[in-house]
Amino acid sequence: MDDLYAINAAKSEFREGFNLADPSRMLAIADPDLVNFSDGQPSEFGESGLDALKTRLANLFERFTAKLSVIVIEIRLQGDIAYDYGWHDLTLTPKGGGEAIRRRNRYVDIWRRNQEGNWKLWMYMDNQDIADPFRPEQIPSAGAQVHGSF
């Protein structure tokens, strides 16, 4: 199987596992030594981190119906290591009723080819995407006072 195809297939499997509320399916793509730096969560490493992540996902899926869309910008291959980056668009709808939560995270995945030749997610980092504060329509005129920091 072509390497780019294999990583795209693994990303699709991650998305499907998320949308079907199946933490085991999601984590089947993970390397046993996964390093997880998810936004707003504790750093997690290896098997204990995978166990904690699985529990956290199960708790999330008990409370919400989840819809994840993955936008991959690029996949770069360098031997037995690869990385991809892009956005995860997430909608969480409370099962008990209420307004849906929408969030867009930017992410970086680092993949490692294992001894069997399969690509596994080795390192994951994400954080919430924000609007560009330097869009021309938001830049004050030369005489305007600016408050805040850059």
Regions found by a protein language model. Name each.
Residues 120, 131-150:
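Terminal "cap-and-tail" regions of soluble proteins that handle hydrophobic small molecules
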Residues 90-94, 111:
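Beta-strand elements of well-folded, non-transmembrane domains
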Residues 87-88, 125:
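A mature extracytoplasmic/lumenal domain signature
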Residues 2-8, 12, 20-78, 87, ...:
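A solvent-exposed, acidic/Ser-Thr-rich amphipathic alpha-helical stretch
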Residues 104-135:
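Short beta-strand edge/turn micro-motifs at domain boundaries
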